[in-house]
């Protein structure tokens, strides 16, 4: 039996990322429930307790088999797992005086030697996402490292083989994270026993096992995940047993369906069809404003269209399975693990899909993988970079980038929170910028809520907006220093209950004043989608021509119903850098590129304002819905 590291999933958005990191380092790892029987730990060399959305003092917390702490196996607790370890040995945990979301500076105690930090410098950047904190250590534990607001950021009890960390070393934004995991595996006396060739073979064998003698119908959005799933299915089963279905749902980018078809044919994929169902999908989201309801309507419509295609092609349902290019983050953010909290419902995790899963009628070959792993698999299959490295484009397409609103004024509850958000923002001191920038800076709140994720919980709050000095013709000063913007953004979201995102205003129609802007009635209609397509295409064309497209993970253009009139809109540029989707940093372009993009967007007569999103994940998700 293969030696393993077991990750106990307390519901963290990053639980499977821990297992993935160990696998990438060459160590086989598995996910298990915290309530697991001790038999699960047979041949286990080490145990990691993940983070989670609960407070240890909530009435409803994940069930935990405390006997696990009696095992003579090394344990590493992360965030919520940090608290479980400390409480298990008599420590005290309560609400932290200051929550930490995003970057923090870890300082190691020079008087304490730790095998976990062997070969790691005494000052490190780490990634935090917590609201609770350890106030006194468990028996036998010593403090290994601290941050400005967290005195027990890293602890150990070597005699018990126990370690606990407040920060998330599983995310790339903790650069020393892989080294910490490598050191933990070394402490566990774990030998390397896993590689990407093994992963590919496991997936192909799994497809053959799950499909049995049936054929497979796959939703093809044209994005990386569905494309590589298509290649995997063709490789495992042969093109004669696989049919790709690309649905033009009316939410595609400019010329997207045409470009997807040409790309597939170029690389030898002939077993796919295109179904134009744009009117059906537009009807499904008509009048909807709630982002969750919109996503669910889109997911259910995919199933409905699939059923009509099956009927039209006379496919015997007893002979066919449905396949999806679902990633593990889709499952996590939809609350699809036992202890996780729903951040947003993905279209491939709505009830209709869940029903098919329960009946064993769906194959999801890459559901245990993250985006960077999927791209590695695609390259191993011989796919071209134009397919493997293109920006993600999920099934719902641009529909989730069109924010919707049914009223021209905020509700009483929203108005109250909006005013509280503005009051909070006014009280936050931003001293990151030079005197010239600080003198002209204006702080405001945009009255359009967006989705975020903080401490493993979904948030739905307002964005803060920073405006620098005007430079004529409606354009505003663009700060050069990305780090100062990031620091200001973190200061705002870490200090606020009502703000989860920060943007800077780059352009405002010079004929308009601030008081001309109001929340407008706006829905996901063809007219708004066409406007968004034009703006989005300008950005993407400029990213390609400047070679910036390949330097970032994804760019989203967001359409806000915040303008001077109903047929106009404001737009947000949202470029991000990420490896695994679970965390991200906003990308920052050269000033010349931003100015070129802005000048082209400003020439469109329906554009009232343009903003740039300077928020990392957490506290914000990639998209606003």
What spans do the regions from the language model cover?
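Glycine-rich phosphate/diphosphate-binding loops that line cofactor/substrate pockets in enzymes
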Residues: 1, 40-43, 207-214
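Flexible gly/pro-rich beta->alpha loop and the following alpha-helix that scaffold active-site loops
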Residues: 4-7, 12-78, 83-89, 182-193
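Short amphipathic alpha-helix with an adjacent loop that forms part of the alpha/beta core around
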Residues: 36-43, 118, 308-314
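Pocket-forming structural segment of enzyme catalytic cores
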Residues: 38, 62-78, 83-175
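Structural motif
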Residues: 48-50, 164, 323
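Glycine/threonine-rich flexible loop motifs
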Residues: 53-63, 175, 332-338
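Glycine/serine-rich phosphate-binding loop and adjoining beta1-alpha1 elements at the start
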Residues: 170-198
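ATP/NTP-dependent adenylation/nucleotidyl-transfer catalytic domains that generate, transfer
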Residues: 188-192, 196-625
């Amino acid at each position: 039996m293969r030696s393993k590291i077991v990750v106990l999933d307390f519901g963290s958005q990053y639980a499977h990322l821990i297992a993935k990191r160990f696998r990438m380092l060459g160590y086989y790892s598995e996910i298990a429930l915290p309530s697991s029987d001790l038999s699960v730990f047979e041949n286990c060399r080490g145990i990691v307790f993940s983070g989670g959305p609960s407070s240890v003092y909530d009435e409803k917390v994940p069930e935990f088999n405390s006997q696990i702490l009696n095992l003579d196996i090394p344990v590493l607790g992360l965030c919520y797992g940090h608290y479980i370890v400390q409480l298990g040995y008599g420590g005290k945990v309560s609400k932290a005086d200051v929550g930490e979301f995003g970057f923090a500076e870890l300082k190691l105690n020079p008087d304490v030697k730790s095998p976990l930090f062997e070969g790691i410098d005494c000052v490190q950047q780490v990634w935090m996402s917590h609201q609770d904190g350890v106030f006194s250590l468990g028996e036998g534990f010593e403090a290994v490292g601290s941050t400005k607001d967290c005195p027990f950021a890293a602890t150990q009890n070597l005699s018990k083989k126990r370690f606990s960390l407040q920060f998330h070393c599983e995310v790339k934004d903790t650069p020393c994270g892989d080294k910490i995991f490598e050191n933990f595996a070394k402490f566990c006396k774990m030998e390397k026993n896993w590689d990407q060739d093994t992963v590919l073979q496991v997936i192909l064998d799994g497809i053959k096992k799950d499909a049995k003698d049936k054929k497979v119908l796959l939703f093809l959005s044209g994005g990386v995940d569905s494309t590589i799933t298509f290649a995997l299915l063709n490789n495992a089963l042969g093109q004669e047993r696989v049919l790709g279905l690309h649905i033009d749902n009316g939410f595609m980018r400019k010329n997207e369906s045409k470009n997807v078809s040409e790309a597939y044919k170029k690389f030898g994929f002939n077993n796919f069809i295109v179904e134009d169902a744009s009117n059906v999908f537009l009807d499904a989201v008509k009048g909807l404003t709630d982002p969750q309801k919109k996503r669910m309507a889109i997911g259910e419509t995919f199933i409905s269209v699939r059923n009509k295609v099956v009927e039209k092609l006379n496919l015997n349902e007893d002979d066919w399975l449905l396949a999806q290019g679902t990633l593990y983050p889709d499952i996590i953010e939809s609350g699809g693990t036992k202890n996780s909290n729903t951040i947003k419902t993905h279209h491939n995790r709505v009830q209709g899909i869940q029903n098919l899963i329960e009946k064993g009628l769906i194959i999801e070959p890459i559901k245990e993988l993250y985006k960077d792993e999927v791209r590695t698999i695609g390259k191993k299959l011989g796919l071209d970079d134009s397919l493997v490295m293109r920006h993600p484009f999920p099934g719902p397409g641009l529909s989730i980038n069109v924010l919707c609103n049914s009223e021209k004024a905020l509700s009483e509850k929203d108005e109250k929170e909006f005013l509280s958000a503005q009051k909070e923002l006014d009280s936050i001191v931003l001293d990151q910028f030079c005197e010239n920038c600080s003198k002209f800076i204006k702080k405001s709140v945009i009255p359009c809520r967006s989705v975020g994720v903080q401490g493993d919980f979904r948030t739905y709050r307002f964005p803060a907006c920073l405006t620098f000095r005007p430079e004529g013709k409606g354009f505003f000063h663009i700060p050069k220093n990305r780090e100062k913007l990031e620091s200001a953004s973190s200061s705002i979201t870490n200090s606020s209950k009502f703000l989860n995102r920060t943007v800077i205003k780059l352009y405002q129609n010079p004929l308009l004043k601030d008081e001309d802007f109001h929340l407008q009635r706006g829905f996901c209609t063809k007219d708004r989608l066409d406007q968004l397509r034009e703006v989005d295409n300008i950005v993407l064309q400029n990213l390609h021509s400047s070679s910036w497209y390949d330097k970032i993970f994804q760019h989203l253009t967001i359409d806000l119903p915040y303008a001077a009139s109903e047929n106009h809109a404001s737009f947000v540029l949202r470029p991000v850098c990420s490896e695994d989707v679970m965390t991200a940093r906003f990308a920052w372009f050269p000033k010349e590129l931003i100015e070129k993009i802005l000048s082209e967007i400003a020439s469109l007569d329906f554009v009232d304002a343009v903003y740039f999103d300077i928020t990392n994940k957490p506290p914000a998700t990639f998209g606003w819905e």
